[in-house]
Each structure stands twice: as structure tokens, then as C-alpha cells.
From Swiss-Prot:
[4Fe-4S] cluster 2 binds at residues 75, 78, 83, 93. The keyword RNA-binding does not apply. One of its GO terms (biological process) is response to hydrogen peroxide. This is Acetyl-CoA decarbonylase/synthase complex subunit alpha 3. [Ni-4Fe-4S] cluster binds at residues 249, 277, 322, 522, 551, 586.
């Protein structure tokens, strides 16, 4: 008897009876395993489970020891508690502070992973329903389409339908991971860290499925370095037109709105703009042929409340992720209808999915309902523009805005009693009382300066005893700068092409391109948006390859040089040294890890399928890269960063990120931790302490710069590469911290490693300060370095990769 597989069949001899079998239990997995056999070489961890990467994870965690920063001394997780875990005490269940802190961090990571995976599931199911499961994956000039999927599952999907198996794999593993959170399950902090790293790898699978599905189905730019430039900023909005604002991360519903606008010639009659990652993806829609874009980006998550308070939107449509919990309540104050288009965020609104569009418009126009849930995307596409057309003249006639008049502004300023409660409540510790004091004397520039630094959380307003609407006051003071707030950002180009990887791979591995700097994440910056611009510009000037995504990519586009050009206009969008490559929205972060993985797979010919440890070992030892999530706030940021860490890619976070409760920092003075194998013969070899962390925080962007440059040093750097990297690290430290690093000499293997412009000076210092023997006639180092340079050395942490093994 032939085996049953997925699909359907009918028994024709039975009258009026049809039996349809949608799925055979186990058939999908069997089919996936059969498919995997077609892929060729396979590593040892295809379809990895909770324990599959444990040996690799523990190897990482042995060098990069977890540094725990608990938020409090109690555990309130079950009804035995709350339990005091201070002073090495254990809770009633037996867990200690380390275990509880590990569990808390792990919970954040799997929450972020689940968020991206659920996004991917919703999007994948929808595009399969609309475009069919046989739609080919088209990501541009690439054969390695899904490096993260292939590494974790062994699969290499070529169609939308084939993406189901990796999606099901992620969902199954997430269920297993979530189970370990339950009381009476895992209690060892080190194993929570291992599971967190595994969850991070799953996150990049979920993100990858999400983005490849939408790039293929929605005709996004496909590995396109010339993806269109998009207007960004509140000053880019034409206030004479009705304004639709989309907020969230899942663009599926918004594409229907854009289709309706195009079919009904509305693109020049109304504005459509976005906040957060939906904004990026709506500007990528149908842009593969580089048509003139009309969708705009208002800004990042930090702009949500500011945009609502401005009164500019005539209707807001929300989907999922990074949507403020007060969007509806704040919008209701200003008669801005809110339409929820995704089951994950319904805001208590009435469901009108089955109602007639015109009847919904009438309900909203009359004020009978403040908005509704609309899950039928065909109706959503028609509903949103119709609401905007109806509400715009009504709201314009009433002049609705939360921004105070000149008279109200003065009254609010004079009400301040300088109690300082607002400053204490502010996550950024902004000196609001001082700014109000200056404003009372007629100097408004201090208030205006707070506009950019303010993250728009309104915590200050809730503690103000005088009930001053502080956010509105800040926005009033900054009206001129807001009206001029206009920049350019390159639309998300998707992944790096195989050809780009081949061309740039050698430079990255040898170190002649100093490194990949990935600037990603949320806008919870410690001192305003210009920090990420400053960091990006500094590294671009030094020929680093800068990759950006999400809110950080938006904020980088808000600043211009003296010639009025943004970084996106000044630097090419190519995957090469000195390139500024915007991959797109949050889910496109998978293409950043994917690029490092493709260097291993394409340039170094490493097997990707089911082979995470070997690929990660390669990136840790050979691919200079460092991530920056300077404003990280969400659980998704934790999972994205942890997914980078399992691949040996370090990440620097902003000062708020100590609240994630865990860092991974090595002890550079423990020399035994800095030994690896030489794959040529299995012998031990010393390596420099680089990277010296996998996850850490910095207090200022000036501190972050040299940290990131140092984190791009790799054991495999050739002399020219090491010299270039040392030059940048030492110069950045001197420029921004006022001192050269104390440990620069640890990275010198011979005189050719030294920065060329300072070689003689540094040789003198090595002789005087470190006691190294120098042949001054030949200007060569005779003795001193503990690390010997061998151009053919093959550093690896995996004994099984050594030839003797």
C-alpha cells in the first residue's frame, strides 16, 4: 500500500460522499525530512530541539559569563510567594536569585520570539490564501534564500507553501520552551541562558519567514541597493489633505488600503503615513520596480503619542506590536477614529467585520462608536479612506488639536511650582522644571530642546500636581522645528545578495573592511535620536559596513549635513565597506544575521543545513561584526539580540537595557578562556580577548563607539586587517574618551599589526611599557607577544572540526 502524504483525495464510488484529508499526522514532518535529504550535506542539528545546541551554548557561556542584574529581590511567580531571594536565600519552590533572574530574562526572549513568530504565521497564512502556496520565493539575485531557516531546520524553502514547515517547527519549539517557565520546571540559571540562546535562534527563523513571505508576495525591493528614498518626519505631511496613519508591524491590512487608494485615484488627494515598522513596509509595497513612492513615514514608536496629540491624523489603523496602550483613549479626546485590523490588538472596540462599510462610516461620523474592529481586509481597504474623507472636514472645522494656544501655553508654564516630580518620573530624567523656569522668563529654547529627547511616554503628566499637560507644552514650544522636521530614509532593500557576499566576504574575514555595524531596535534612547546618527556617521566615515533596520533606521534619516543631505543620500545602499544598508522593518533583522551566515556558507563554503555550531564558530572567529540596539525597550529587542549572540555576534545596548536583567561579559584576564584549536592539526592556539562580550551596555554613545570597534576584532584578521581595526579602535577611544585603550598591546602579534601612522611610536611604547624586545634596525618585534601570527591558522572552538578528529 502506498504511503499517505499531505494533500487530498476522493472516493468516487460513494454517491454524494466526498472524503477530504487535509493533513496526515506526521506527514508534514516526513515530507520535510524527505525534502531535507534533497539538500545535500547536512549538519548534526537539523530540526534542533531544546538540548541540540546546549553544548555550543555552554561553550559560549563558559567564556562569556552571565552577569545578572535583577530588578528586585523578590519572586512573585506563584502562590507560595512572594519569596525573598536576597542574601542567597531560596524561595519556597527551591529556586534561587540566579535561577529566577535567568527565568525572567528567558521569559522576555521567548515573548519576543513568539511575537515575531505569530506575526510570521498570520502573514504567511494570509499571503498563501491570496497568492497561493506555489508562489516562488523571490528575494533578488540569491540562491541562499533562507540561511536562518536552513541552519536551524535543514530545510531550504523555495515557495510560500514550503515556508509552512519551518513555521510549524518554530511554533512547536516555542511550546516546549514556554513549558520550562512553569513552576517546578527548570531552575538552573545557566540552562535558562542556554534556552534563551536557542529561542533567539528561533526568533531569526520566524523573522526570516515573515520577511521573505512579504518581500515575495508584496513585490518589495529585492536585495536592491537603490531602493527608493522615502520622506520621513512630521514636516513631510501635507496638512491640507486628509491623513491616514497606520501604526504597528504587520503590513498585510495596509496593502488593501493602498490598493483602494490607487484604484480610486486617491493617492494625490490624501496622505497615508506610518509609525513604527508598518511604516517601513508600506513604503516597500510594490516598490521592486522603483516606482515613485507616495506613502510616508512619520517616525518611530516614540512619535506615536506626539502625532496623536498634534491632531493631524483623521483616522488611525492599528495592526500589531509596538502600539501604545492609550492610542484609543488619546484619540477619542481628539475625535480621531481608531480601527483595529488584527486579532492581537482589539482595544475593546466593537467588531464590525460583518457590517456594511457605509454603515460603519455613518456610525463613526455620528460619534456612535469611537472606532471598530475590522478583520476583513477587503472592507478595511475601502473603510479607512472613506473615514478619512468624511472626518477630515469635520475635524478641520473644529480645529481639533491638543496643542495649547499661546494663552494656554503661558498659563501652563506659570503653573509649575518646580516640585521636580516630573523629572523623577521621566525615564530619561529630563530637567523639565528647569526648562519651564526658563520658559517663564521668555526663553523657550530649553523646552524646544526637550522635544527630541522626550520619548513621549507621558509619565511626567501623570505625577504633575498642577495637572500641566507637559507633553503638549513641549510640542507647543517645538512647533517651528516640528514643521521643518523632514528627512529621507532608504526603503528597506531586503537581504544582501549572494554576489555582494562573494565580493565582500574576503574583506570581512581578512579585516580590510573593519567590520559590520548593525544598528537596530527601538527608540528608548538615553539622550535623543541623534545618538544613532552620530554612531552611524562615524563608522561610515571609517569604511565600516553599516546595516540598519526599524526605528533606528528611521531616526538616522532625520539629520542632515551642512549640504542638506542625509546619510542615505551620502552613502550607497550596498553591502560593502562604507555602505549604509537598510534591510527594512524589524523582521528584516533576520537578513543581518543571515548576511554573516552567508559569508560562512558562500564565501567559506561551510555547510549551512542543520549546522548552527559550525556556522556560529566561523562568525565568532572570523567575521568582524557588532550590533547596536541603543534604544532597546521591547521583548523583541531582547530576542533579536540573543539570536545574534548564539551566532557569536556581540551586541551593545543602551543604558536602559540593564533592565533586561542579564549581560554576557568575558573576563579578559583569564587566559585559559582565550584558547582555541587550530583546525589544521588540533593543537591549542592563543587568541586575543576578542570579542570580549556578547551582550553588554554602555552609558553614552561616545563610550559605545570604541567598544563596538574593538568588538569587530577577530582572531583570523590578517596583518592589514588587524592594523586597520586597531587604528579605528585607538582613534575612537582617544577622540571620544580622551584616552587610548590600556590593553591595545594584547592584540599585537607582530609589528605589521600596528597602526601604520604610529608604528614607530607604538614600538617604543611596547619596549618601554611591556618589555618587548625590538630590533630597531629592522623595526621588527623580536619577542614579547603571547599570540603568534600565522596567516594560515584556522581558529575554531570545535574539536570535531580539527583534521586529527
Amino acid at each position: 500500500m502506498s504511503k499517505l502524504t499531505t494533500g487530498s483525495f476522493s472516493i468516487e464510488d460513494l454517491e454524494s460522499v466526498q472524503i477530504t484529508i487535509n493533513n496526515i499526522v506526521g506527514a508534514a514532518k516526513e515530507a520535510a525530512e524527505e525534502k531535507a535529504k534533497e539538500l545535500g550535506p547536512m549538519g548534526p542539528t537539523a530540526m534542533a530541539g531544546l538540548a541540540s545546541y546546549r553544548s555550543w551554548n555552554l561553550l559560549l557561556l563558559d567564556r562569556y559569563e552571565p552577569v545578572l542584574t535583577p530588578m528586585c529581590d523578590q519572586c512573585c511567580y506563584c502562590t507560595y510567594g512572594p519569596c525573598d531571594l536576597s542574601g542567597n536565600k531560596r524561595g519556597a519552590c527551591g529556586i534561587d536569585m540566579a535561577g529566577q533572574t535567568g527565568r525572567e530574562f528567558f521569559l522576555r526572549v521567548i515573548t519576543g520570539t513568539a511575537c515575531h513568530a505569530a506575526h510570521g504565521r498570520h502573514l504567511l497564512d494570509h499571503v498563501i490564501e491570496v497568492f497561493g502556496e506555489d508562489l516562488p520565493l523571490n528575494l533578488g539575485e540569491s540562491n541562499v534564500l533562507t540561511p536562518n531557516v536552513t541552519i536551524c531546520t535543514g530545510l531550504s524553502p523555495k515557495t510560500l507553501g514550503e515556508c509552512r514547515a519551518p513555521m510549524e517547527y518554530v511554533e512547536e519549539q516555542l511550546t516546549q520552551l514556554l513549558a520550562t517557565i512553569h513552576a517546578g520546571q527548570e531552575s538552573a540559571e545557566i540552562d535558562y541562558d542556554s534556552k534563551a540562546l536557542f529561542s533567539g535562534s528561533l526568533d531569526h527563523v520566524g523573522m526570516e519567514v515573515s520577511d521573505i513571505a512579504q518581500v515575495s508576495a508584496y513585490d518589495f525591493p529585492k536585495a536592491d541597493p537603490e531602493a527608493p528614498l522615502i520622506e520621513i518626519g512630521m514636516g513631510s505631511i501635507d496638512k491640507s489633505k486628509p491623513l491616514i496613519v497606520a501604526i504597528g508591524h504587520n503590513v498585510a491590512g495596509v496593502t488593501y488600503i493602498m490598493d483602494y487608494m490607487e484604484e480610486n485615484n486617491l493617492t494625490d488627494k490624501m496622505e497615508i503615513a506610518g509609525l513604527c515598522c508598518t511604516a517601513f513596509d508600506m513604503t516597500r509595497y510594490k516598490e521592486a520596480d522603483r516606482r515613485a513612492p507616495y506613502a510616508k513615514i512619520v517616525g518611530s514608536l516614540a512619535k506615536e503619542l506626539k502625532v496623536i496629540r498634534s491632531g493631524m491624523p483623521d483616522v488611525i489603523v492599528v495592526d500589531e506590536q509596538c502600539v501604545r496602550g492609550d492610542v484609543l483613549s488619546e484619540s477619542m479626546k481628539l475625535k480621531i477614529p481608531v480601527i483595529a485590523s488584527n486579532e492581537k490588538i482589539m482595544m475593546g472596540l466593537p467588531d464590525r467585520t460583518d457590517a456594511d462599510v457605509d454603515s460603519i462610516v455613518e456610525e463613526i461620523k455620528s460619534g456612535a462608536i469611537p472606532g471598530c474592529v475590522m478583520l476583513d481586509y477587503d472592507k478595511l481597504g475601502e473603510l479607512i479612506p472613506k473615514i478619512a474623507e468624511v472626518m477630515a472636514p469635520i475635524r478641520d472645522a473644529e480645529g481639533i488639536t491638543a496643542i495649547p494656544t499661546d494663552e494656554e501655553f503661558k498659563v501652563y508654564i506659570d503653573k509649575c511650582v518646580k516640585c521636580g516630580e516630573c523629572m523623577l518620573a521621566c525615564p530619561e530624567e529630563l530637567d523639565i522644571p528647569e526648562a519651564l523656569e526658563y520658559a517663564a522668563k521668555g526663553s523657550y529654547e530649553y523646552l524646544e530642546a526637550l522635544h527630541d529627547v522626550c520619548i513621549g511616554c507621558r509619565r511626567c503628566e501623570q505625577v504633575c500636581k498642577k495637572e500641566i499637560p507637559i507633553l503638549n507644552v513641549l510640542e507647543k514650544a517645538a512647533q517651528k522645528s516640528i514643521s521643518e522636521e523632514k528627512g529621507w530614509v532608504r526603503s528597506g532593500r531586503g537581504q544582501a545578495s549572494d554576489a555582494e557576499i562573494r565580493a565582500e566576504g574576503l574583506n570581512l574575514v581578512m579585516g580590510t573592511t573593519p567590520g559590520i555595524i548593525a544598528i537596530i531596535g527601538c527608540p528608548n534612547y538615553p539622550a535623543g535620536t541623534k545618538d544613532v546618527y552620530n554612531i552611524a556617521e562615524e563608522f561610515l566615515k571609517r569604511n565600516y559596513l553599516v546595516v540598519v533596520s526599524g526605528c533606528s533606521a528611521m531616526d538616522i534619516g532625520m539629520y542632515k549635513d551642512d549640504d542638506g543631505k542625509t546619510l542615505y543620500e551620502r552613502y550607497p545602499g550596498t553591502f560593502s565597506g562604507g555602505g549604509l544598508l537598510n534591510t527594512g522593518s524589524c523582521v528584516s533583522n533576520a537578513h543581518i544575521t543571515g548576511a554573516a551566515e552567508k559569508v560562512a556558507g558562500i564565501f567559506a563554503q561551510r555547510t549551512l543545513a542543520g549546522n548552527l555550531a559550525e556556522v556560529a564558530d566561523y562568525t565568532l572567529n572570523r567575521v568582524g561584526a557588532c550590533g547596536l540596539a541603543w534604544g532597546a525597550y521591547s521583548q523583541k529587542a531582547a530576542s533579536i539580540g540573543t539570536g545574534c549572540n548564539i551566532y557569536g555576534i556581540p551586541a551593545v545596548l543602551g543604558p536602559h537595557s540593564s533592565k533586561y536583567r542579564r549581560a554576557l561579559i568575558a573576563k579578559t584576564y583569564e587566559e585559559d578562556k582565550w584558547k582555541v584549536f587550530d583546525a589544521r592539526d588540533g593543537s591549542e592556539m592563543n587568541i586575543p580577548p576578542a570579542p570580549e562580550f556578547l551582550l553588554t551596555t554602555a552609558e553614552t554613545w561616545q563610550e559605545a563607539l570604541p567598544m563596538m570597534a574593538k568588538a569587530c576584532i577577530r582572531p583570523s584578521d590578517n596583518n592589514m586587517g588587524r592594523s586597520i581595526k586597531l587604528t579605528h579602535w585607538m582613534e575612537l577611544s582617544k577622540k571620544y574618551l580622551g584616552v587610548e585603550p590600556e590593553d591595545w598591546w594584547k592584540f599585537v602579534r607582530n609589528e605589521a599589526d600596528l597602526p601604520l601612522a604610529k608604528r614607530e611610536e607604538l614600538l617604543k611604547r611596547l619596549e618601554a611599557e611591556q618589555g618587548w624586545e625590538i630590533d630597531w634596525k629592522r623595526k621588527k618585534i623580536i619577542s614579547g607577544p603571547k599570540i603568534k601570527f600565522d596567516v594560515s591558522a584556522q581558529p575554531t572552538n570545535l574539536k570535531r572540526l580539527c583534521k586529527e578528529a
